[in-house]
């Protein structure tokens, strides 16, 4: 009889992941890739940095992530750059470098300035999508998108490993973040896109 405790095995698995941040964090971009895809300008740091994962929320930053400082109606991501860097962001993308102080990024994070951070997010998602030679089903319309997406993903999942939009995470940000969840094991993607602008 071999002693087995699933709690111990689970803990060992989690601890082994902490040793290598690249183990479960995608997408992986070099900073040179980020600059080439976005047309951004490197303000601080060096191009030898590797990015593990993309985040637009400073509260969920993981070690090695690239934080993209989006600007919304009620918030400005530039205000959260210090929190993102303190939480382990390897780099930040901003549209106005004058809004962040050198102390906010310290010596560890890279700073890339672009004209439009939302556009940069979409460009990075597009570049990441092109790494996968899988079919993509896009759903849009004025009503019924989420229900149709859920049904289609459920049907396809009977035969394939499916990536699909969670809930109604279907705006420009949500679509990009869904694409960043693509993994080599996925065989098809079902993506929902809202129609709130021309």
Predicted segments — roles?
Residues 1-123:
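N-terminal leader/targeting and accessory segments in enzymes
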């Amino acid at each position: 009889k071999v002693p087995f405790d699933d709690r111990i095995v689970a803990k060992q698995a989690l601890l082994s992941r902490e040793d290598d941040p690249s183990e479960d964090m995608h997408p992986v971009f070099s900073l040179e890739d980020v600059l080439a895809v976005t047309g951004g300008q490197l303000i601080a740091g060096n191009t030898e940095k590797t990015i593990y994962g993309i985040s637009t929320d400073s509260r969920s930053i993981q070690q090695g992530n690239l934080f993209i400082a989006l600007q919304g109606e009620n918030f400005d991501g530039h205000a959260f750059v210090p929190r993102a860097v303190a939480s382990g962001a390897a780099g930040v993308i901003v549209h106005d470098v004058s809004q962040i102080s050198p102390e906010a990024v310290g010596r560890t994070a890279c700073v890339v300035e672009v004209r439009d951070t939302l556009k940069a997010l979409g460009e990075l998602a597009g570049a990441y999508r092109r790494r996968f030679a899988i079919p993509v089903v896009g759903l849009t319309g004025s009503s019924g998108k989420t229900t149709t997406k859920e049904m289609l993903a459920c049907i396809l999942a009977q035969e394939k490993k499916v990536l699909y939009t969670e809930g109604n995470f279907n705006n420009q940000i949500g679509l990009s973040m869904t694409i960043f969840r693509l993994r080599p094991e996925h065989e098809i993607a079902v993506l929902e896109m809202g129609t709130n602008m021309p």
